[in-house]
Amino acid sequence: MIKAKRLEKGNTIGVVSPASPSENRSEIVRAREYLENLGYKVVIGRNVNKTKGFTAASEQERAADINEMFAREDIDAVFATQGGYGSAQIIDKLDYELIRSKPKIFTGFSDITSLHLAIQKFSGLVTFYSPGMAQFNEEDLSEYTKESFFRTLGIPEPAGEIKKSSPKKWLTSIHGGVCEAPVVGGCLTLICASLGTPYEIDCKDKILFFEDVDAEPWIMDHALSHLRNAGKLNDAAGFMIGHCENCVPYDYKPGFVCDTTLEDVLTYYLEPLKKPALYGLPMGHGDDLATLPLGVRCRLDADKKTFTVLEAGVI
């Protein structure tokens, strides 16, 4: 895997909106001020503040912003504002050879999973599953999230063990065991959307990381059955399931009543595989979000309930 140079004070961050537009432009303004106060320079993409239907700007405009940020010599890192919807629309319009030849830090989560998968597959670049740029302000960015983000991007050393954000949080070992392998994945919905396309996730002998938000257990069941039928669960060396925000049974209409939990679903699909599987670390949607370098080697110990990044994500 190719690695970008570490993020240093004085570096310039290019901001793009590959998916949904920000609900409020003030989010981008506040985030820019926050990053500048920390000592970084910030360049907002030409089309970040546009809106077209479900997305921020047209497919061509959103892709052009990303290609431009990677091409510009004065840009050191590329931050996505947020997820939402629409990243998959532009993955066939990115210049992957350009990205390979000019590796830069690329961050984002949720819907940005489509870009992570595509960039890793066609450019071989380590990217970072991390909070969106629009979250960067004193009110929304927890100390846990901030420390993990700037340490992982700013220090050319392994991030080490990703720990619980609070002693009150719980972790569940779906199945015990230990494995060491590169980590791949992201938001489960987008992982499934990659199947059958040139950008399909490769889970062979890798730790599959996934999380999701607002997905009822039956929706998670649907996604995992899809991955099982595609052979991806059998391919994986182990499973790291992050925090799944609001993935609980909703109120059902008469005739469709179910109290099956997400943990029930995870156990049903993953326990029979007899591979290490750990659920509950703060990677995903929530108040606390650890930054995960995708593509680097990690150690999953489901017996001790630990997940450790063994390789630096930057140089």
Where is each model-derived feature located?
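N-terminal glycine-rich "phosphate-gripper" loop used for MgATP/nucleotide binding
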Residues: 77-88
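Conserved beta-alpha junction segments in alpha/beta enzyme cores
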Residues: 22, 26-27, 178-213
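ATP/NTP phosphate-donor binding region
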Residues: 1-74
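A short helix->loop->beta-strand "cap" motif at the edges of active sites that frequently abuts
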Residues: 74, 100-105, 123-125, 236-237, ...
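Internal helical hairpin/lid segments
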Residues: 202-262
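Short, acidic/small-residue loops that bind anionic groups at enzyme active sites
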Residues: 94-119, 126-133
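ATP/nucleoside-binding phosphotransfer catalytic cores, i.e., glycine-rich phosphate-binding loops
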Residues: 241-315
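Conserved anion/nucleotide-ligand pocket segment
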Residues: 124-190
